[in-house]
């Protein structure tokens, strides 16, 4: 989840089909995809929900959040307002699924010269909301996209008790 145009759909497309498009098309509602990955000796199926970042779709988003195992929150490293809005996204998530594990993703890491987000502000949010972890990605180059989803799967699997 996150503001519009932060790269949520691009991250998912990069992970699922190893593709990237420069053309921005706003997501409408919710798009669901799944991806299998090998985790230790287990095959894990991730069901990934791409939810529109536009306020018009808030009610749709909340209908789909129940039963979610983890929320990935994405902001744009070149747009400080998208980081500032993360707490609003967390409040929306917690209204439906309190205490869900959260992951914070700073996207567009390839735009090094355009970066405007302060790393201390990121650190404060990670600590305040006790995020699973924070990672910077580039959907355009593919940097850290696969590790993002692998790390989510690993954290979720390690939290499952063996009984």
What would you call each of these model-derived segments?
Residues 1-163:
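TRAFAC-class small GTPase G-domain
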